[in-house]
C-alpha cells in the first residue's frame, strides 16, 4: 500500500496509528500507553519482545515499539510492505515494514503552521519551515506539541485525570 501527501491530507491522517484505518491488514492498536504500541501486519506482530513490523523513516530504522506512536508533519509518502522484508531491511521485519519518507528541503521550501482543537481541552500546534540556501544545502525544522486534560474523572478529587502532553521535533 502506498500513500502520498495528497492522500494523507485528504484522509486526515496525522499519526502512524491513523495509517491502520486505511491500509488493509495493518493493525496498530491503542493499548493506552505510548510505551507498548505494537503493529501487526496480517495478524503477525509482537506486543512483548522486539517488533515483527519494522518502521523506517528516511531509511533510518526505528527499532523500538514505542516509535509507532508519534504524530508527523512534512510527510512525502508512506509505503506499507507486507510479508517478510528481512532481505532488504534486516531485523524486525518478519511481518512487514512501514516505510515513511519526509519532504526534502531541497525540493520544497516554505513554512506551515497547523492548529488543532477538540474535546476535553485538546489542542495542538505543529510548525515547519524549509529553506534552501544553495543548490546543495537546505534545511528543514519542524516541531509539534499536543495536550489534553484527560477524559477520566477522579471522583475523589473531582478533577479530570489521564491528561496527556506530547511534543517533538526534527531537523533535517
Predicted regions and their residues:
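N-terminal periplasmic accessory domains that precede
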Residues: 16-19, 38-43, 56, 80, ...
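Short acidic/polar hinge/loop motifs at secondary-structure boundaries
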Residues: 58-84
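Transmembrane beta-barrel wall of Gram-negative outer-membrane proteins
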Residues: 110, 117-148, 152, 156-172
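A general structural signal for stabilizing positions within well-ordered secondary structure
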Residues: 10, 17-20, 69, 88, ...
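Short beta-strands and strand-coil junctions in structured, solvent-facing domains, enriched
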Residues: 10, 26-29, 46-48, 62-64, ...
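Extracytoplasmic beta-strand/coil segments of soluble accessory domains associated
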Residues: 17-60, 76
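N-terminal periplasmic "start-of-domain" segments of outer-membrane beta-barrel proteins
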Residues: 1-8, 37-38, 53
Amino acid at each position: 500500500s502506498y500513500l502520498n501527501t495528497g492522500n494523507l491530507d485528504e484522509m486526515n491522517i496525522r499519526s502512524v496509528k491513523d495509517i491502520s484505518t486505511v491500509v488493509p491488514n495493518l493493525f496498530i492498536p491503542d493499548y493506552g500507553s505510548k510505551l507498548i504500541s505494537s503493529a501487526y501486519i496480517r495478524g503477525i506482530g509482537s506486543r512483548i519482545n522486539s517488533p515483527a513490523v519494522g518502521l523506517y523513516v528516511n531509511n533510518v530504522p526505528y527499532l523500538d515499539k514505542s516509535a509507532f506512536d508519534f504524530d508527523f508533519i512534512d510527510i512525502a509518502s508512506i509505503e506499507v510492505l507486507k510479508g517478510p522484508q528481512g532481505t532488504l531491511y534486516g531485523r524486525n521485519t518478519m511481518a512487514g515494514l512501514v516505510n515513511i519518507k519526509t519532504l526534502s528541503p531541497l525540493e520544497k521550501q516554505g513554512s506551515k503552521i497547523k492548529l488543532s482543537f477538540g474535546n476535553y481541552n485538546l489542542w495542538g500546534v505543529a510548525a515547519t519551515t524549509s529553506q534552501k540556501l544553495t543548490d546543495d544545502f537546505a534545511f528543514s525544522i519542524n516541531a509539534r506539541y499536543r495536550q489534553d486534560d484527560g477524559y477520566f474523572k477522579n471522583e475523589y478529587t473531582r478533577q479530570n485525570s489521564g491528561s496527556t502532553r506530547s511534543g517533538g521535533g526534527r531537523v533535517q
